[in-house]
From Swiss-Prot:
Signal peptide: none annotated. Its main location: virion. It is a peripheral membrane protein. A motif (PPXY motif) lies at residues 24-27. This is Matrix protein. A motif (PTAP/PSAP motif) lies at residues 37-40. Pfam families: Vesiculo_matrix. Residues 1-12 have a biased composition (Low complexity).
Amino acid sequence: MSSFKKILGLSSKSHKKSKKMGLPPPYDESCPMETQPSAPLSNDFFGMEDMDLYDKDSLRYEKFRFMLKMTVRSNKPFRSYDDVTAAVSQWDNSYIGMVGKRPFYKIIAVIGSSHLQATPAVLADLNQPEYYATLTGRCFLPHRLGLIPPMFNVQETFRKPFNIGLYKGTLDFTFTVSDDESNEKVPHVWDYMNPKYQSQIQQEGLKFGLILSKKATGTWVLDQLSPFK
């Protein structure tokens, strides 16, 4: 039997797949897309028979729960919020995770960065400052991204280095985003932004690849994701 397995190229060690829905792939296994779609989506394609296809003018509202734990370690103290977002925006470089949740993670990362607090200097490792933030909440997001796939209650963790100008260090983020099917009223997601930086939402969001516009009512809408971030 063992020789038969060798002929077929089968390993004697089996890798069991998780039967739980919504679990992300292991982040140390890269599965790059070697080709990109070159034709418009059609209801004739497999699995799209009854799908409500993307319409850039269609405004949708997504209601969800979220949790974020964020730790940023830097070689030197940040001088401004602009420095903070320049570093934090690097968190999803070479992104491997749930694609449908990525826009929501980006928004939560922007909001989380506005709440970062430095640890006491005496606790800083080798005099290198550490910043942290923890957020939980329920909210809604107006967007024009088309149909969003179901978001299961699954935790994803990302650890990335950054090297921006004078600053270099590491980013450790843990996200949980899931659909909120309750009938309770919830605030707009940007209401969680630190009031001190509310006026910078559009500008800072762009660093994370978020293209935002404001409705006549003053509500922020996520129009699209930048292809350059």
